[in-house]
Amino acid sequence: MSAQSKSPTKARRITAPDIRARKGGEPLVCLTAYDAPMARILDPHCDLLLVGDSVGMVVHGLDSTVGVTLDMMILHGQAVMRGARQALVAVDMPFGSYEQSPEQAFANAARVMAETGCQAIKIESGTYAADTIRFMAARSIPVIGHIGLRPQAALADGGFRAKGRTQAERQRVIDEALATAEAGAFAIVIEGVAEDLAREITETVDVPTIGIGASAACDGQILVTQDMLGVFDWTPKFVKRYDNMAERTDAAVAQFASDVRDRSFPSQREVYTMKRSDG
């Protein structure tokens, strides 16, 4: 049995009520995860792991999140649940899986939770989504909202840009936050807004806010793990790079290629030998 396949000691799983109870307390630590090995590494350090629809761009090479399917989210949700033992795991509802009606949203969210075993789902929550959140929350689906810059709506909203910079836009984001919290979401992701707006929302709503490009005024922070680790050449303004994984991986692969070509790999340390005869 490999070291990777050994089951870690079972820890108590963080729940939606646990996250909600952290309002105003120690900041929530959240990252994205798309597979079991990375989830296993992140799990001891995180309160929440999000299987984001960003998987479409980060893992599958899509240009946006719009092409992500429910089956893709379920597949990656299952993988993350195999690696995470302690953090709450939330799965994004992809574009087109919840907008038609509350009934459609509930049916698809129930399928995600049943087939992955995750503890919550997340939807992008304009004010139009309040009835959907309320419908799901009343039927025991823990929901995280997502306001401000909403990637699934980027094509309609004019691209990936910060929100709330005009008075009208600012009020729209506040209205989204109030509607999302009132409808029953247990936490709200705020993306791409100025610090003063994030602070106002955080001080107004009674559920934790989780910022991504929304300053330290929020109740917690989330980043795309690959952005934080330096996997890509381009880094968003709001990301702090904690590593340069692309550069280190490139160097490691270059060394492997060199070792193969000069036949220094495999060496005798990496080669099986026949057992000596007992006779």
Curated annotation (Swiss-Prot):
Keyword terms, alphabetized: Cytoplasm, Magnesium, Metal-binding, Pantothenate biosynthesis, Transferase
A single BP term in Gene Ontology: pantothenate biosynthetic process
Transferase found in the keyword field: yes
Pathway this chain belongs to: Cofactor biosynthesis; (R)-pantothenate biosynthesis; (R)-pantoate from 3-methyl-2-oxobutanoate: step 1/2
Location relative to the cell: Cytoplasm
Cofactor(s) for this UniProt protein: Mg(2+)
One GO MF term: 3-methyl-2-oxobutanoate hydroxymethyltransferase activity
Record: active site: E191 (proton acceptor)
Keyword Metal-binding set for record: yes
Binding, Mg(2+): D53, D92, E124
Record-linked CDD domains: KPHMT-like
One Gene Ontology cellular component annotation held by this UniProt entry: cytoplasm
Family indicated by similarity: Belongs to the PanB family.
The protein's name in its UniProt record: 3-methyl-2-oxobutanoate hydroxymethyltransferase
Organism: Maricaulis maris (strain MCS10) (Caulobacter maris)
Gene: panB
